Amino acid sequence: MKNNKISGFQWAMTIFVFFVITMALSIMLRDFQSIIGVKHFIFEVTDLAPLIAAIICILVFKYKKVQLAGLKFSISLKVIERLLLALILPLIILIIGMYSFNTFADSFILLQSTGLSVPITHILIGHILMAFVVEFGFRSYLQNIVETKMNTFFASIVVGLMYSVFSANTTYGTEFAAYNFLYTFSFSMILGELIRATKGRTIYIATTFHASMTFGLIFLFSEEIGDLFSIKVIAISTAIVAVGYIGLSLIIRGIAYLTTRRNLEELEPNNYLDHVNDDEETNHTEAEKSSSNIKDAEKTGVATASTVGVAKNDTENTVADEPSIHEGTEKTEPQHHIGNQTESNHDEDHDITSESVESAESVKQAPQSDDLTNDSNEDEIEQSLKEPATYKEDRRSSVVIDAEKHIEKTEEQSSDKNK
């Protein structure tokens, strides 16, 4: 992400603080389950812990935009595609589980399908709310933070381990806890792949998958009452689907790479085979910008110096030409014959005209030097040329006026002598 990037220290502290607050709140909120009077299979109060932890971290730590980058609520075609997968994958897991029950246990349990103490709609709404608050914290917030320094695959592993610890169930023994850990970790890995490359639009996908899984398991299996075979079937089924889905995704992207000869980063941002090195990329980009700015400044300085040099030379040439004009006029002293005076006057006019032409040519030469500079510096060069050109024009006009006065004076003197 291009942004005010989270430093490595803040990144680690954010993950640590989130996990500590989540675990502490999950312990403290257990006592409130009986107080609010809601059954745990409808809504688990401890599931509020990730949501509260995410809100606290957003308020405490800086770079709010980076922290909220995974909390977008817009819809895209990719989101719709992943939403369909979020409904299909739980169905595949449940089908594998039911087939396993029919094969190895002769039947599967349709738990509490009759004689429920609450309507099914209440259970559905409760599971959607539970899925939203949990995934808001773990997927939309925590996984987004972890992915700022890791790619999706390793970020999913980190978040999966934390989620498995949060969801650990040691009530029914070590073996049950081990299969429950496998189930929740595989569950989290599937979710990490589902929300990959969705550009922060994660909450719909994660909530849909989570609610579909928990709602189906409530009715079809009895793992929540400690049945070891049920949790074993669910864990293995979920792990098989996780390996198959992630492996198939990698194969498809690998085929796309072989056919297009483009790397996976071009096909999908934040891929498994490319580690995110935001700090190094930022430093490299800043170094390139600074070097280009230095080169532009050097070019501008050279162009300005050359322009000033041309203007200065033109001014010196104009000043140096003035004495020659005066000397030429002084040589036109009255002669013994009017014809000689007229010829000298014509010579002076010719000299003045030739000097004007040369000066004009020198003025034309100055803009030619502008072609050597960049287009962005043309205004500065024209501004620097404006004052020397005006000065030269004033000097030439004064020289011409002096010459005309001198000619008139010599003509008057010659006419007086003739009289």
UniProtKB/Swiss-Prot annotation:
Stimuli inducing this protein: Up-regulated by the two-component regulatory system WalK-WalR.
Effect of residue 106 to C: Increases average length of lipid-linked peptidoglycan products, when part of the SagB-SpdC/LyrA complex
InterPro entries: Rce1/LyrA-like_dom
Location(s) in or outside the cell: Cell membrane; Secreted, Cell wall; Cell septum
Region (Disordered): 273-419
Pfam families in alphabetical order: Rce1-like
Positions with biased composition (Acidic residues): 372-382
Compositional bias (Basic and acidic residues): 282-299, 323-336, 344-353, 383-419
Keyword Nucleus among record annotations: no
Keyword annotations: Cell membrane, Cell wall, Membrane, Secreted, Transmembrane, Transmembrane helix
GO biological process: CAAX-box protein maturation
Entry annotated with the keyword Secreted: yes
A molecular-function term among this protein's GO annotations: endopeptidase activity
Cellular component, GO annotation: plasma membrane
Source superkingdom: Bacteria
Membrane topology (UniProt): Multi-pass membrane protein
Membrane-spanning segments: 9-29, 41-61, 84-104, 118-138, 153-173, 175-195, 202-222, 231-251
Effect of inactivating the gene: Abolishes normal short glycan strand length. Reduces biofilm formation. Cells show an increase in lysostaphin resistance, without a concomitant decrease in beta-lactam resistance. However, mutants are also reported to show an increase in lysostaphin resistance and a decrease in resistance to the beta lactam oxacillin and to an antibiotic targeting biosynthesis of cell wall components, tunicamycin. Minor defects in peptidoglycan and pentaglycine cross bridge structure.
Record text about domains: C-terminal region not involved in glucosaminidase activity of the SagB-SpdC/LyrA complex.
Function: Involved in bacterial cell envelope homeostasis. Regulates peptidoglycan processing by N-acetylglucosaminidase SagB, perhaps acting as a scaffold protein. Pleiotropic regulator of gene expression, probably acting via interactions with multiple two-component systems. Plays a role in the abundant deposition of the immunoglobulin G-binding protein A (spa) at the cross-wall, a subcellular structure that initially arises from cytokinesis. Probable virulence factor.
Entry similarity comment: Belongs to the LyrA family.
Subunit annotation: Interacts with N-acetylglucosaminidase SagB; interaction is direct and facilitates peptidoglycan processing. Interacts (via N-terminal region including transmembrane domains) with sensor protein kinase WalK (via N-terminal region including transmembrane domains). Interacts (via N-terminal region including transmembrane domains) with sensor protein kinase SaeS. Interacts with other histidine kinases, perhaps via their transmembrane domains.
Protein's name according to its UniProt entry: Lysostaphin resistance protein A
Species assigned in the record: Staphylococcus aureus (strain NCTC 8325 / PS 47)
Lineage: Bacteria, Bacillati, Bacillota, Bacilli, Bacillales
